[in-house]
Curated annotation (Swiss-Prot):
Residues 451-463 have a biased composition (Pro residues). GO terms for cellular component: outer membrane-bounded periplasmic space. It catalyses: [protein]-peptidylproline (omega=180) = [protein]-peptidylproline (omega=0). Its EC number is 5.2.1.8. One of its GO terms (molecular function) is unfolded protein binding. One of its GO terms (biological process) is protein stabilization. The keyword GTP-binding does not apply. The PPIase activity resides only in the second parvulin domain. The N-terminal region and the C-terminal tail are necessary and sufficient for the chaperone activity of SurA. The PPIase activity is dispensable for SurA to function as a chaperone. The N-terminal region and the C-terminal tail are also required for porin recognition. This is Chaperone SurA. Residues 1-25 form the signal peptide. SUPFAM superfamilies: FKBP-like, Triger factor/SurA peptide-binding domain-like. It comes from Xanthomonas axonopodis pv. citri (strain 306). Residues 441-450 have a biased composition (Low complexity). It comes from the Bacteria.
């Protein structure tokens, strides 16, 4: 399912852009300096300061759930480093965002926030952020999204057998689970000392939670190495097919509010919290859609055929059919759609939006047996003949599609997190924040303080 652009961009823009009431509080800034060197790129101190302010603005009224400023700064800086690394890798893979695409994206963001692009610019200026910086943030987010999509297309697959198994599990349990997690990361091929350090740290975090000194979300913000740490480790609602098999059986036996772990996973040690449960089948009902059976003839536009030539050709073809020529025979002879020409242009049964909105509108407007006027799509010039229509229950089909998507999303999350660890491990990263504990650290992500012997937080956080 495609999310609204404002939602898709939210995670990164929360870090890299402002639109924050705190931003305007800093009216004057010292001369900018480098906060981190990331291979051949840099993170500027102004970027880091802006990102930290935005995280704090999201926790307004819940400040006691945030870690100390030095820890928060490290977490945010590490996330900015990962963004830089992904953008660099995307550039190496030829992933680009044109100015036109960027303009459309920003216009969409403005519209979904109830304003115009000019209004958005004014809001950004009032909050202390330059429009050029905002454009760069949006461009980076689109690039990261495309890198992730490219990764999914090349490395993630879901078999029909996996879908069948997941559907059987869903039928057996009928439940969905709202989960949160804390990850104490381990590098790939971790040695015994690194594993022991990770085990000590995760045991310390679990002890803090068990004693009530930190609630789970606050502990996630403070200690988790997961990309969603600053969201309290919230994983949202998951069905069992979205949960790694090693954890699925544990979750079945848990009650809301319980915390399981430490558990060893591919990326390190994890603590898993079951926040709440719900019936996945509640409100289930048939979903009926109109499907159409149609044939079409396509004349393409290209180097060997101009727009005018293609239009003249499709007009001639339609005139022949209206004059009595058989549509299927004419399609076999004249259509330039190689996928359907051999079947006389037959497209089978399909929902109206299957071939794009323009094609769908033409099919919907026809009566059975009628032939459309020539119309243009990105593919070229068409005529279409509607053969029939029917009402179809697509509940089972939709359910399979949803399950396939959730399995793919879970696989992508696991694999992409490992991919990010690889990127980070291969990179030259040097922090220049002025903190001796962090500066000049290279090729290994910054970690939060070891909680094995933690000092108590300033105040007990609330949920």
């Amino acid at each position: 399912m495609t999310k609204p652009f404002s939602v898709v961009l939210a995670s990164l823009l929360a870090i890299t852009s402002t639109v924050s009431p705190l931003a305007s509080a800093q009216q004057s800034q010292p001369l900018d300096r480098i906060a981190a060197i990331v291979d051949e790129d840099v993170v500027l101190q102004s970027e880091l300061d802006r990102a930290v302010r935005n995280v704090k603005s999201q926790y307004a009224g819940r400040e006691n759930q945030l870690p100390p400023d030095d820890v928060l700064q490290r977490q945010v800086l590490e996330r900015l480093v990962l963004v830089k690394l992904q953008v660099s890798r995307a550039d190496g893979n030829g992933i680009r965002v044109s100015d036109e695409e960027l303009n459309r994206a920003i216009a969409s963001i403005a519209q979904q926030n109830g304003t115009t692009v000019d209004g958005l610019r004014q809001k950004l200026a009032a909050d202390g952020m330059g429009y050029a910086d905002f454009r760069a943030s949006v461009r980076d987010e689109i690039i990261v999204q495309r890198l992730r999509q490219s990764f999914a297309q090349s490395r993630i697959s879901v078999s029909e057998g996996e879908v069948d198994t997941a559907l059987a599990q869903q039928a057996a349990t009928g439940s969905q689970y709202h989960l949160a997690h804390i990850l104490i990361g381990l590098p790939e091929g971790a040695n015994a000392e690194q594993i022991a350090t990770g085990q000590k740290k995760v045991d310390g975090v679990k002890a803090l939670i068990d004693k009530g000194e930190l609630d789970f979300s606050a502990a996630a913000v403070r200690y988790s190495d997961s990309p969603n740490a600053l969201e309290g480790g919230d994983l949202g609602w998951r069905s069992l097919d979205e949960i790694p098999n090693a954890f699925a059986q544990l979750i079945r036996d848990m009650q809301p509010g319980q915390v399981a772990g430490p558990l060893r996973g591919p990326s390190g040690f994890q603590l898993l919290k079951l926040v709440e449960m719900r019936d996945a089948n509640a409100g289930g009902e048939k979903k009926m859609v109109t499907e159409y059976h149609a044939r079409h003839i396509l004349v393409r536009i290209g180097d060997n055929q101009t727009e005018a030539q293609a239009k003249a050709k499709i007009d001639t073809i339609r005139a022949r059919i209206v004059g009595g020529a058989d549509f299927q025979a004419t399609a076999k002879e004249s259509s330039e759609d190689t996928n359907s020409r051999g079947q006389g242009g037959d497209l089978g049964w399909f929902p109206a939006d299957a071939f794009g909105p323009d094609f769908g509108k033409q099919v919907e407007s026809l009566t059975d047996g009628a032939v459309s006027e020539p119309f243009r799509t990105q593919a070229g010039w068409h005529i279409v003949q509607r053969v029939g229509s029917r009402q179809t229950d697509v509940s089972a089909e939709n359910q399979r599609a949803q399950v396939r998507e959730t399995i793919g999303r879970r696989k992508l999350e696991e694999e992409y997190n490992r991919y990010l660890q690889e990127l980070r491990g291969e990179a030259y990263v040097s922090y220049r924040t002025g903190d001796r504990a962090d500066d000049n650290a290279t090729a290994a992500p910054a970690k939060s303080p070891d909680p094995a012997a933690p000092s108590p937080p300033p105040a007990k956080p609330t949920r």
